[in-house]
Every structure is written in structure tokens, then in C-alpha cells.
């Protein structure tokens, strides 16, 4: 009789714990994901702002080095949207990037961000673009990208 009572109490507590964990998972996972994404976006923006201090002539030669330091894919885009260098792909086969939402936002505000699917890498990516200016003239953009799958 004591073992049946123990089993009923144990089963009740077990069910309650599973329900509490499920509810916490449902509500906390999106909040944690948003917090982590925001932190990654802020770090990428910081890296992009530092890179944007370089000239458009310097950036393409250092794209691999910059990508390694930022732990992100780096794309150098001229003011017309043509890709001048990319740390992951050959720039000759890449589309014009001027109409990408993060680039358009960077054109208007100096920094632009977007979360969207990359056809090139076939996964959801976080993008940060920073306008590169020389003597107050827009020269192009530094765009950083990281997978949201990581």
C-alpha cells in the first residue's frame, strides 16, 4: 500500500515537473535565442565599424584576414552594389548586392541588419552591413554574415 501511494505521488510530481519544464522551454527558448542573436549582431556591428575605417582599396586584399578575426563571412561591396571581394565565394559569380535590405539600410543609416535565407550558403543567415565613407562620400559597404544555425 505504501509503494502504491509513493508511486502515485512520484508520478504526480514527475508529470508536474515535465509540464513546468515544457512551459519554461516554450517561453524561454525564444527569449534566449533573441538575446543571443542581439549580442552576435552587436559584435558583428562593432567589427564592421572597425573594418569600415579602412579604405575601399585596402579592404579586398584583407578580406580573408578580416573574416577570420570577426569569425564571420565578409563581403566588400562597392557603392554601385558590385561585390569586390568575399571571404567565402568568388566575387565574379555573385549578384549585385545593392538591393539587399541590409545594404539599403546601411546606405540610409550607416548600418543595416537583416535575417534571411542565403541562396549561396543555403541556410538562414544574420547580416550586418556598414557603409564605408571616405571624406563624407559613400565608397561602398562592408557586410558581415553569420549562420543562425550555429
What spans do the regions from the language model cover?
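Membrane-proximal, non-catalytic sensory/regulatory domains of signal-transducing membrane proteins
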Residues: 57, 93-142
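Juxtamembrane segments flanking the first transmembrane helix
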Residues: 1-83, 88-96, 107-111, 133, ...
Amino acid at each position: 500500500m505504501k509503494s502504491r501511494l509513493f508511486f502515485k505521488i512520484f508520478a504526480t510530481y514527475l508529470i508536474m515537473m515535465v509540464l513546468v519544464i515544457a512551459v519554461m522551454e516554450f517561453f524561454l527558448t525564444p527569449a534566449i535565442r533573441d538575446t543571443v542573436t542581439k549580442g552576435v549582431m552587436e559584435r558583428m556591428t562593432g567589427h564592421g565599424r572597425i573594418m569600415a575605417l579602412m579604405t575601399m582599396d585596402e579592404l579586398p586584399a584583407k578580406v580573408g584576414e578580416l573574416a577570420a578575426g570577426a569569425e564571420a563571412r565578409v563581403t566588400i561591396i562597392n557603392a554601385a552594389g558590385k561585390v569586390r571581394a568575399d571571404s567565402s565565394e568568388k566575387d565574379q559569380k555573385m549578384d549585385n548586392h545593392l538591393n539587399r535590405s541590409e545594404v539599403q539600410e546601411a546606405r540610409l543609416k550607416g548600418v543595416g541588419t537583416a535575417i534571411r535565407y542565403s541562396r549561396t550558403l543555403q541556410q538562414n543567415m544574420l547580416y550586418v552591413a556598414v557603409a564605408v565613407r571616405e571624406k563624407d562620400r559613400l565608397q561602398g559597404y562592408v557586410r558581415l554574415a553569420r549562420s543562425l544555425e550555429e
